[in-house]
Amino acid sequence: MAIIDSFVGSSKISARDLNVHYGEKQALFDVNLDIPVGQVTALIGPSGCGKSTFLRCINRMNDLVEIARVSGSLFLDGIDIQDAAMDVVQLRARVGMVFQRPNPFPKSIYENVAFGPRLHGLAAGADELDEIVISSLDKAGLWGEVKDRMGETGTSLSGGQQQRLCIARAIAVAPEVILMDEPCSALDPIATAAVEELIDELRGSYTIVIVTHSMQQAARVSQRTGFFHLGKLIEMGETESMFTSPQHPLTQGYITGRFG
């Protein structure tokens, strides 16, 4: 039985008896959790523990894996996203994702950010599209660095700038949730600090769920933390409490470095 504390406020995302199989291998076992609106929730645990699998359930990226099978319920604002009637394109507009390695499109910086709003019809004309692009880059802390380089390719930027461009691209379609799967693992310490500062600035405007192998990063950026082990949610609670007084022996062992 997972140890999960309660929190004040409403849930943006709720999982109930969520199970995931890849072929014959079960990756998640009866996961039950709630993710509060407008906060940063970190998911930690050893490699292969299921945290990224859970993250991919939130925007149904597992639909793209032929052998994946998902059962149970996963709610976004009370609506089960596993329902066959769910519009997955609209879901992924509401739930943006930033991947482990920066993956800018082979297009200009401008087009990287403009692509999503144009696809979803979010801009009435060129002027409004410009406003969305500039606002998104500004929110991602990148506008000042690229405002004179908008015609250059996204791949011409540094690794840290590319990752912030990907965050701007996610922001541009006005998501409610931003998923981040190890967003700093390929970045140097300076670029990592910039992304972490950005996450803190985005908190409140978005519900953010971040998977990280770095417990130090989880402690710095999140308000709540969930610990996964062998496909099971072991413990979830306020980040400060999790790191100072974990309640489950497995959580304590992982945090103190006895395994992982």
From Swiss-Prot:
Catalytic activity, reaction form: phosphate(out) + ATP + H2O = ADP + 2 phosphate(in) + H(+)
Alphabetical list of SMART domains matching this protein: AAA
Keyword Coiled coil tagged: no
Biological processes per GO annotation: phosphate ion transmembrane transport
One Gene Ontology molecular-function label: ATP binding
Enzyme Commission number(s) from the entry: 7.3.2.1
Coiled-coil intervals, chain numbering: none
Keyword set includes Translocase: yes
Primary site of residence: membrane
EC category: translocase
Protein function: Part of the ABC transporter complex PstSACB involved in phosphate import. Responsible for energy coupling to the transport system.
Family affiliation: Belongs to the ABC transporter superfamily. Phosphate importer (TC 3.A.1.7) family.
Subunit structure, as described in the record: The complex is composed of two ATP-binding proteins (PstB), two transmembrane proteins (PstC and PstA) and a solute-binding protein (PstS).
Protein name: Phosphate import ATP-binding protein PstB 1
Organism field: Paramagnetospirillum magneticum (strain ATCC 700264 / AMB-1)
Gene name of the encoded protein: pstB1
